[in-house]
Amino acid sequence: MFDIQYKQDIGIGQLKLGMTSDELENALLQMKKQWSNSSDEAMQMECCAETDDPNLITGRYMDNDLFFLVQYRNGKATEIVIQRDLSKVASIKLFGMDMFNTTAECIIDSLMKKDNVICNEKDLQLGTEYIFPEIGVRLWRERAFHPKLLKDPLYMEEMQAVLEDEYQYQYFQMITIIG
């Protein structure tokens, strides 16, 4: 299990904001050794500039099971992104909540008691991106799904063929730790 730390020492497990790429890569390899379900495959690591800003570098760390994305500014990690697949080998918790196995609605309601939320939709239950600036976390899902949509006949008609797949969008797919 890895807890998301906030305020002092913001990070996920041993991965901390403010680390250099070398420090973060070493910490990631140490964490990977702890995951009994993780493959023995070597982790691919690459860093590249994706914008015109020479001080902003994106690091990608991946193997068959896992994917991490890290933004570095001036050589220090400023964002750490983890995907849902990590929950196959580690439990990711914030304030005691399992961030990938608790519904988005429960997570949002709980975090709103601790911080203001910035959401890309007026209806908080149907947003895809949520930012909690004081806590230092951004939550994302590809599409929004809430059981209230099942009461909408037009939604039911349009989504009938893929309705079972839609249930996965009750959960977040990516969590970003931001400084």
Question: Which positions does each model-derived feature cover?
Answer:
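Non-cytosolic coordination micro-motifs
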Residues: 1-52, 79-179
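Hydrophobic/aromatic-rich structural module bridging two neighboring secondary-structure elements via a short loop
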Residues: 50-73
